Amino acid sequence: MCLVSQEMRKLAPELDPLRIGTGWKKEDLGKVQVMVESTYGDSHPGSGHLNILVEEVRKGIAEEGGFGARYFCTDICDGESQGTDGINYSLASREMIANMIEIHANATPFDAGVYLSSCDKGVPGNLMGLARVNIPSVFVPGGTMNAGPEMLTLEQLGMYSAQYERGEIDEEKLDWAKCNACPSCGACSFIGTASTLQIMAEALGLALPGSALMPATSPDLLEYAKEAGRQSVRLAKMKNMKPSDIVTIESFENAILVHAAISGSTNCLLHLPAIAHEFGIEITGDTFDRLHRNARYLLDVRPAGRWPAECFYYAGGVPAIMEEIKQHLHLDVMTVTGKTLGENLEELKNNGFYEKCDKWLQEFNKRYNINLTKNDIIRSYDNAIGTDGSIAILKGNLAPEGAVIKHTACPKEMFKSVLHARPFDSEEECLDAVLKHKVQKGDAVFIRYEGPKGSGMPEMFYTSEAISSDKELGKSIALITDGRFSGASTGPVIGHCSPEAVDGGPIALVEEDDLIEIDVIERKLNIVGVKGERKSMEEIDRILQERRIAWKPRKPKYEKGVLRLFSQHAASPMKGAYLEY
């Protein structure tokens, strides 16, 4: 067994005393050295408890004869920065987390790594970082928070806030929702970006089977963290199995099929391609569209479904989803257990995993005085909620590279429609118009210059919630943007419109009262008329050419700092918006 940590000790005589000064004992220096990297911090509930899991990981490492060193790079919370310029830092923070993992791992020799995070940018940042570092690694998902009273979950706050702004509820009701929506640590309890990415980590084979989206307060999660520590040492000692030995294009295809089955966040179209890029694998929006077509949508969990995210684990989690779609999966892919996916699934059927999950489901039933079964949460393949996946990539003269819609969260009435354009150059202007009832039935509301190069690609969460929570507008208008949406967003919202406005994409050329065609079934997104009148496609092409000649590029929004760097080098949203150099 050749360990890089021991080779470096021979080359750098100061390494041992520096580690002893940090608290290592002399006998620790010759052990397998594992970097335990987490997003622990007081930044939000998804990271606030990770220090507890870190210590369990270190115990597991020690049990296998290794030593775990703690490294931290906390993440920010989209929910805490919503509605402010702080949200512009969100996507860029993913790159910085990956960069810090690279720096931590490569500046100091380690034989293996364990990575812990729960939420939107922490999970993909960790997965990008572990791919880049490529030492034997295990990822530990931080789990989900519990639901509150009346099964209240955080994604409902946007609805409550919009109702309050419209005078539909009083301040007392809004305050009740605020005080009860986050009753514990963990990721927000719906299938938003955080939950989706935890599930993707397991589906890729980088987390232990069954570990994604456990309740963060569960003792099961502590044991999984400890086992992840043990497994990291085993991988370093016995197989030196690296992430690049595990993750293949077939792994990503499995993950995307799971994404379809859970109706996962559209932000995965930013994160999975960026993770794949670090592995030297190319996936795009077209990959998602191909695999989602005819795929089964099975999960009845919020925001598209009825139940909070903790129910996902109680119903059997990722393994239960994979069992239902097994005939479409690559079962021979390798996983972090050192076994294939097919071997893992068979083992879980025989080791009491599903029986343990069901016991937790019965406890949940008692808590809320209901009688849920596994099949109420995860449908069978033959009784699927939907049979065309959960997202679609729309293309046309408005989005030549593509735009994404989560059609499972969109009213069927909007699947084929022609609307009147109402363009806005910032979310603030658009939200103000929606709340003041200046947007009408039949409008297509545009928010542009909010892509990666424009402003950092923030979420349009408040605007989408204001629209979807309005009984009239939620079924009669669309929101189209080169920005993105929260994983909690519902309604007729189309994001990632590419090329983005700042690059002169067609979304920058849209004018008031252009006619906008949306066709989810045929995957079309086109400008089909101007000033409220239909035109031929040849006429539209000519008009867009004239508008392009008159269009003037905007001055860069940022002149210094992280967002200047990100806006200069971010790739197209359809490629993953990672940094291109």
Task: Say what each PLM segment does.
Residues 1-46, 55-73, 79, 85-90, ...:
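Catalytic or ion-coupling anion/metal-binding cores of large enzyme and transporter domains
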Residues 105-126, 138-141:
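A short, small-residue-rich loop immediately preceding and capping a beta-strand
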Residues 52:
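Acidic/charged coordination and interface sites in well-structured regions
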Residues 49:
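Glycine-/small-residue-enriched capping loops at alpha/beta junctions
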Residues 90-99:
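Glycine-rich, highly charged phosphate/nucleotide-binding loops
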